[in-house]
Amino acid sequence: MYFQNIDALIFSKLLDTLLNIFFLLFFLVLGAEFTLYIINVYFPNLLLYGNALGIKFVLSILGSLIAFPIGLVFQNNYKNFLNYINNFTVDIFFTSLLSIIGALFIANLYFSFLDISSILKEFLFIKYLLRLLIQTILCYSGFILVTFHSDYLLNILVPEMAEAIFSYNKIVRPSITRVLHTSYIINHNIIAIFQSQFVEGLVLIPKSTIQELQILNNSKNFKDKYLGRLGFSRLNELKYNYFDQIILESSLTNCHENVLFKYNKTYNNEQQNIVLMSSCSNNIKESNISQLLISNLFPLIININKLIELLKLPYLSGESFYLQIVRKGKRLGQGIGYLEDGTMVIVNAGSKYIGQKIKVIVKKVWQKSTGKILFTQPIKNS
């Protein structure tokens, strides 16, 4: 399934590139043809002086150059429109289509008045411009109206279809692309959670997450450096074992390129993930384990007992384990070590074991929303 998602992204990028080329070529040809049409209709004598073929060639190139920026503007607006309607549910899309058809029907009724009106018979340009203006206003107004009241209108017009569409939206849902937070990568449960297949769909690693890990890795603080290296190690393990599910932001194909390159300068790392996911037209599901928001990352229908088993404390009071003492603590005689997930372990009378791996027993656990600290003491004859 994930291979199919990646193939779909690659095909979408290829199709998007071909469509961009088509738009640009279309406007280049349109600009050249429109310029030649203006010359032939309004300035026919211009071709009588000099080389007619050369004049047409130069003017067509000039028309193409003028039409080129117009094509770029149209191309950008078309991409924005596609990303906007990609978020539509079936009911909104159906009612929007009906509103546009109804708006065009009402506009045609009004156009019949314009056709018989003697006032505008001599002003054809104003007549056609008025046609375009009325069509645009009615279509846009109907489109905006049903976007906010699609459920109500669909229940009135086609109640049977409204019920079927409601069931479709509730049952048939596309997999959600999730953002992997930095603190989530360095958490010791991340590998186990992937192994238990709680995470469905694609998982996106933003550039901000890589940058945060790099900052930690380059830090002079021992704990930060340890967490940075641990994060890169776990990220590499995830990419190796779940390469069909993990996607780096740089390889993403269906987002706004302008957003991806510009948002780093205006948002912090938390806001960048939100802008990134909204630009990819996906529901935002982001979590920070240290803030106990694990419920926002996964679907509601999950094995709660298994999730609790994964998220429980690694060691409880009275349990023992081996620990590498890496430095002195703040108080006299204390030694400091770290678990695999970066949890600080304070060892009473452990400063003399710096650089050694000893067996300790847990005396007390401090659990807070920001993390946990284990208080231990060495086991004699360990």
Swiss-Prot record:
Keywords: Chloroplast, Plastid. Residues 314-375 form the TRAM domain. PROSITE patterns: TRAM. It is found in: Plastid, Chloroplast. GO terms for cellular component: chloroplast. InterPro entries: PIN_dom, TRAM_dom. Belongs to the ycf81 family. This is Uncharacterized protein ycf81. The lineage of its organism: Eukaryota, Viridiplantae, Streptophyta, Mesostigmatophyceae, Mesostigmatales. The gene is ycf81.
